[in-house]
Amino acid sequence: MPGSPETPEQVTAVEQRSGHLEIIGETAAKLLLFQQGWNPYSRFLDQDKVDIILRRNRDNQPEYREIQVKYRRLYTPSKPSRWDAKLFSAVAWYTADIDEFAAHRASLFVMFVFGYPDRQIEKDVLIFPSRAFHEIIQQSPRHKKEGDKRALFMAKAKADGRWHIMLTRKKFLEIDNVSCINVHQYANNFSVLD
């Protein structure tokens, strides 16, 4: 493609000039939400965990939703011999405070936009109501042995493309209710905003 970086040095130079990755996530989220009939507005200040305010008219009545956008890089298991490479095609992680979304508001949603290291955007996004996301955080393993932060490992299953959040940081041999939470109902489910 004309104008695309050709060498690893050119790719690195482009990455160094690129804006903050969160901006990429918010821009992708705005486009996706606009395609779903919402009018997205950016907040000048990131207050109350809100990056984007959505507005639309339904039956001549305005509706509003608040979105916290999380952009996360997806990594493909680098070695086919790794245990996770047998189960997952891509993995992203997010570290959360245990009570990060404890203050529930029915209008608040958490949207994950994923990108690969080459800046290609994953076609799937995850959209969680804040209460559901808080409950998932509570079930997730500790980030470190001490402290209240939780480690959320979001992974796309190799077999069927369904999304899961791992319940353990230890090796497991199959995807089941003990090893993972199936969160595929939140993948590209824009109707959760209704």
Region annotations inferred by a language model:
Residues 1-48, 53-194:
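Mixed-charge (Asp/Glu-Lys/Arg
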